[in-house]
Amino acid sequence: MVVMPPQNSVNESEGRYLQDGFWQHGRFYGSWKPGKYLFPIDSEELNRLDIFHKVFLLARDNKPFLAPIRRPSPRIMDIGTGTGIWAINVAEECLSDAQIMAVDLNQIQPALIPPGFMPKQYDIEEPSWGPLLTDCDLIHMRMLLGSIQTDLWPQVYHNVFEHLTPGIGFFEHIEVDWIPRCDDDERPANSAFVKWAELFLDGMDRFNRSVRVTPQEHRQMLEAAGFTDIRQEVIKAYVCPWSADRNEREIARWFNIGLSHSLEAMSLKPLIEKLGFEAEEVRELCERAKRETCVLRYHTYCNIHVWTARKPGPQQ
């Protein structure tokens, strides 16, 4: 059943614009270009996206970006902005004079936005990014694996490169590798979380929207697009706060909350529509995985990958 909210209607409890959408598998999905974004856009999902903003801030010493900004009134794009929280954070706390275009397939940004914040509904799988901001000092992207057709990543990186300023334009890309890892074998032999991850990755592969993090391939695609000064950082995010390290515990607390909101939201469509699961089977697996990720004696973690790169100048 398609739900059509009134034009420019506002969800007062969340303070966000609603967009046309439909209910499926018990969740609300966006109806603009359906099938491209496989995850919900309901309140629970928007909260999940905001929680991961906190995770990434903690993982990066509370810095929303690390690229040097060398011009006054910089031009910035946030690709796949989601709720817009990163772009709003930058506009309000870091670069109040910046012009920031926040691009997403779905219109789920807040009703009240800071000066310089420009929400833009656009499909970044389009071959040309003609309507988007050019001459950018910084382009930021995170958690877009699964939202981009697997074979279109070289095209996306090329368009990022084309929209940066030569010499001083930087790109930052952050992804979570959802494959659970453990360095000391402290996790259950028949891990529900491992099973969930295997099925989720398989289902997304069958949609041709892979969520697999392949560091060497990403580096090669960035090099092929023309980037230089390519760096990659890998940060552990434990799924529960067992570590003696205070920072690791704090990242883990927030990652655990985000993960508990993520399991069902991310896996309903791939497991039901590509692997033949019933909705209740998916939810039962997710509940078992949630319980497992809250057991302190299990030392499972996921890796957060951060790529930074620069567009060289004409003489470089």
Curated annotation (Swiss-Prot):
Q: Which reaction does it catalyse?
A: L-methionyl-[protein] + S-adenosyl-L-methionine = S-methyl-L-methionyl-[protein] + S-adenosyl-L-homocysteine
Q: Name one GO biological process term.
A: methylation
Q: What happens without the gene?
A: Impairs production of beauvericin and attenuates virulence during infection of tomato plants. Impairs also growth on the non-preferred nitrogen sources nitrate and nitrite.
Class in the EC hierarchy, top level: transferase
Question: Could you tell me where this protein is found in the cell?
Answer: Nucleus
Got a GO cellular component term for this one?
A: nucleus
Q: Which domain of life is it from?
A: Eukaryota
The UniProt record lists the EC number as 2.1.1.-
What's a Gene Ontology MF term here? methyltransferase activity
Instruction: Supply the name of the protein.
Output: Secondary metabolism regulator laeA
Identify the species of origin.
Fusarium oxysporum f. sp. lycopersici (strain 4287 / CBS 123668 / FGSC 9935 / NRRL 34936) (Fusarium vascular wilt of tomato)
